């Protein structure tokens, strides 16, 4: 992986500039083949990806996007990494809203996004790529406890659709 990396703690590193690789990795784990125009941040440990976030469906007005997350282990999840992952949409892009859509039956993923601070908004019938129902969660910028007003300083632009 010839991408830029930042080291937020111990052996965990942020991986930037490898959007396609990270998106394919995340997509293969959550069952999404194509995110469309997107950006991604990976989290690596020992030279391999252990987690990744894909930022897609960016709408400058009203300032919203979709965050898709996959992970092999919870060990990557610390305050400094979360500050970077949420600093990108809320700090750099100036988004006012981030959405996470989770397969209805994936209880562990639903608990995870709730612990991050996403709030349940409703069920989208047959909205998952497999035809299953999807739980829709969202977080507003002022609800995000992971970043201050300045964001993280991470720069990874989402291309215009």
Protein language model features and the residues they cover:
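Conserved GNAT acetyl-CoA-binding A-motif
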Residues: 91-102
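Short amphipathic alpha-helix that is part of the acyltransferase structural core
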Residues: 1-30
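Conserved acetyl-CoA binding element of GNAT-fold acetyltransferases
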Residues: 61-73, 101
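Conserved beta-strand in the GNAT
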Residues: 48-57
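Conserved active-site alpha-helix within GNAT-family acetyltransferase domains
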Residues: 105-122
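A short helix-loop-beta-strand connector motif used in the catalytic cores of GNAT acetyltransferases and
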Residues: 31-42, 62
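Conserved catalytic-core motifs of GNAT/GCN5-like acyltransferases
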Residues: 101, 119-134
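C-terminal "cap" of GNAT-fold acetyltransferases
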Residues: 127-159
């Amino acid at each position: 992986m010839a991408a830029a990396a930042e080291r937020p703690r111990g052996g965990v590193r942020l991986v930037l500039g490898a959007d396609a690789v990270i998106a394919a990795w995340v997509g293969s784990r959550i069952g999404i083949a194509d995110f469309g125009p997107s950006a991604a941040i990976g989290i690596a440990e020992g030279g391999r990806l252990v987690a990744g976030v894909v930022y897609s469906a960016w709408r400058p007005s009203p300032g919203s996007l979709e965050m898709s997350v996959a992970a092999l282990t919870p060990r990557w999840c610390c305050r400094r990494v979360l500050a970077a992952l949420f600093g990108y949409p809320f700090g750099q892009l100036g988004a006012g809203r981030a959405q996470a859509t989770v397969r209805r039956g994936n209880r562990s993923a639903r608990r995870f996004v709730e612990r991050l601070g996403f709030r349940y908004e409703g069920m989208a019938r047959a909205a998952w790529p497999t035809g299953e129902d999807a739980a829709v969660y969202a977080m507003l910028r002022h609800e995000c406890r992971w970043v201050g007003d300045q964001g993280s300083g991470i720069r990874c632009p989402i291309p215009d659709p």
